[in-house]
Amino acid sequence: CIGYHANNSTDTVDTVLEKNVTVTHSVNLLEDSHNGKLCRLKGIAPLQLGKCSIAGWILGNPECESLVSKKSWSYIAETPNSENGTCYPGYFADYEELREQLSSVSSFERFEIFPKERSWPK
């Protein structure tokens, strides 16, 4: 046959639109491992939360204190099932909304409403 090449194959793949599509040739291009390094975007490093959740970082979990010094980032990397979340009992309402809001922010300033030095008696 002139004009095309085909081979017999029983390879099936899942595409964006269909599952188990028979193809004549397939190469798996998806990565199934990660080296742990995250890329900078426009020269700015990501904020890697490590064992902290976004809630633990924002609300001041003592285990997340090292993240307070981070002033800017290109994106936030939160690991699934982070150990250090909120350190008080209760449910964090609208957690997904907080994550969504922070996804478009590259920095913020944290301040104390009641500074310890001036607000509390010694």
From Swiss-Prot:
Cellular localization per UniProt: Virion membrane; Host apical cell membrane
GO molecular function: host cell surface receptor binding
Annotated membrane topology: Single-pass type I membrane protein
InterPro entries to which the protein is assigned, alphabetical: Capsid_hemagglutn, Hemagglutn_HA1_a/b_dom_sf, Hemagglutn_influenz_A, Hemagglutn_influenz_A/B
Post-translational events: In natural infection, inactive HA is matured into HA1 and HA2 outside the cell by one or more trypsin-like, arginine-specific endoprotease secreted by the bronchial epithelial cells. One identified protease that may be involved in this process is secreted in lungs by club cells.
Record key words, sorted: Clathrin- and caveolin-independent endocytosis of virus by host, Clathrin-mediated endocytosis of virus by host, Disulfide bond, Fusion of virus membrane with host endosomal membrane, Fusion of virus membrane with host membrane, Glycoprotein, Hemagglutinin, Host cell membrane, Host membrane, Host-virus interaction, Lipoprotein, Membrane, Palmitate, Transmembrane, Viral attachment to host cell, Viral envelope protein, Viral penetration into host cytoplasm, Virion, Virus endocytosis by host, Virus entry into host cell
Protein's job: Binds to sialic acid-containing receptors on the cell surface, bringing about the attachment of the virus particle to the cell. This attachment induces virion internalization of about two third of the virus particles through clathrin-dependent endocytosis and about one third through a clathrin- and caveolin-independent pathway. Plays a major role in the determination of host range restriction and virulence. Class I viral fusion protein.
Subunit structure: Homotrimer of disulfide-linked HA1-HA2.
The protein's name: Hemagglutinin
Native source organism of the sequence: Influenza A virus (strain A/Camel/Mongolia/1982 H1N1)
Gene: HA
